[in-house]
Amino acid sequence: MATEPKKAAAQNSPEDEGLLIVKIEEEEFIHGQDTCLQRSELLKQELCRQLFRQFCYQDSPGPREALSRLRELCCQWLKPEIHTKEQILELLVLEQFLTILPGDLQAWVHEHYPESGEEAVTILEDLERGTDEAVLQVQAHEHGQEIFQKKVSPPGPALNVKLQPVETKAHFDSSEPQLLWDCDNESENSRSMPKLEIFEKIESQRIISGRISGYISEASGESQDICKSAGRVKRQWEKESGESQRLSSAQDEGFGKILTHKNTVRGEIISHDGCERRLNLNSNEFTHQKSCKHGTCDQSFKWNSDFINHQIIYAGEKNHQYGKSFKSPKLAKHAAVFSGDKTHQCNECGKAFRHSSKLARHQRIHTGERCYECNECGKSFAESSDLTRHRRIHTGERPFGCKECGRAFNLNSHLIRHQRIHTREKPYECSECGKTFRVSSHLIRHFRIHTGEKPYECSECGRAFSQSSNLSQHQRIHMRENLLM
């Protein structure tokens, strides 16, 4: 008698598939919530770190108060009551690693919220691989000669610096146009300038025309070395009448006339006439008084680098017509970085990602790789954040406390779910009847009333139920029958 219902239930494969889809969607939704919460925690951690590093002695009334405040800020950042010694060590190593990176690379890595030094290295390696094929060309501005390799022989001391796009066989680490100093020296006692090396760094895999790194040394009678900051992007400076210099863009029409700076060399601050921007050479940062505005679409940007990126996207495939920095096929690949194309695709399920590090993390789902192991019980996890949450089971730690009732939780998502009891918030609404719920799982359970889905089946008689609690209650009937027999 019991075999016939089992055969009938086995034929309901569409229902089983529907159940599987519902479970997968529920897991993806919960995973998405955990990802947002994790990113929020990383942002909070970074804020605490900056408060600790930027604390000044003048902010406290005395030395004892200063020490106490520093200790408090350090605990807020490293959270020794939550993190293990290994995790605290990893945070310190990661901070120092980001500190020694150039400023542009720091910004790029920070945007991806790395949790460990290994993740930061993976992000940088991904960035290098994506920009290895950029081909650049430098042309002499006045003589029309193409200059390859990394040296220039200037004719005189009045510095007349010109910027041109370059195409060279040398290997570069960025998709940014290479910049070359073209120095004119008119002094009789001048000697040939030293070799000038062309370097470039990357800011969020963007073409940086607005951020200037390094220090500019003045020429006073005799030629001096004007390339003092090795490993940084060199920018074009044009000295007019011995009073001002002008910084211009490498591609007038492709990028638009973005930057035409009239600079004062005497001070540390350089002002921009068009948008009243101010550049601090020492801090390598722009402090805007106004936003740069794109003339075609009227969109404004706070940072010049964002403005340039917008110009690139807006120009699209037209960029290759105005300069020799990129040829058409390479331009398409280069522009894909800014357009948000997901070029890294999973061979198993076809899901695409923008960065190879995210793809590598995703592929652990298919391979079953679990590289993070618990020292207490030996259980392994695919994500470091999962291991951190698991360790709280052993430590009994519940760092997330409710301010209303004092109840504590080991996960922030559980605290958020609990707080809806106090706020009476019900964000999950049924599209069929409009009924709302505090938890997404309650909405999924309720939705089975409308769909008629009964995913929980009794192994004894084949009867199906919409809720697992009803199945458990039903199975007690069979248990009693077995005891009586």
UniProtKB/Swiss-Prot annotation:
CDD domains: SCAN. A zinc finger (C2H2-type) spans 290-314, 344-366, 372-394, 400-422, 428-450, 456-478. Its main location: nucleus. SUPFAM superfamilies: beta-beta-alpha zinc fingers, Retrovirus capsid dimerization domain-like. It holds the Pfam family zf-C2H2. There is a cross-link at residues 23, 162, 195 (Glycyl lysine isopeptide (Lys-Gly) (interchain with G-Cter in SUMO2)). Expressed specifically in testis. Belongs to the krueppel C2H2-type zinc-finger protein family. Residues 62-127 form the SCAN box domain. GO terms for molecular function: DNA-binding transcription factor activity, RNA polymerase II-specific; RNA polymerase II cis-regulatory region sequence-specific DNA binding; zinc ion binding. The keyword Mitochondrion does not apply. InterPro entries: SCAN_dom, SCAN_sf, Znf_C2H2_sf, Znf_C2H2_type. May be involved in transcriptional regulation. It is found in: Nucleus. Gene3D superfamilies: Classic Zinc Finger (3.30.160.60), DNA breaking-rejoining enzymes (1.10.4020.10). It comes from the Eukaryota. One of its GO terms (biological process) is regulation of transcription by RNA polymerase II. This is Zinc finger protein 165. Keywords: DNA-binding, Isopeptide bond, Metal-binding, Nucleus, Repeat, Transcription, Transcription regulation, Ubl conjugation, Zinc, Zinc-finger. GO terms for cellular component: nucleus. It comes from Homo sapiens.
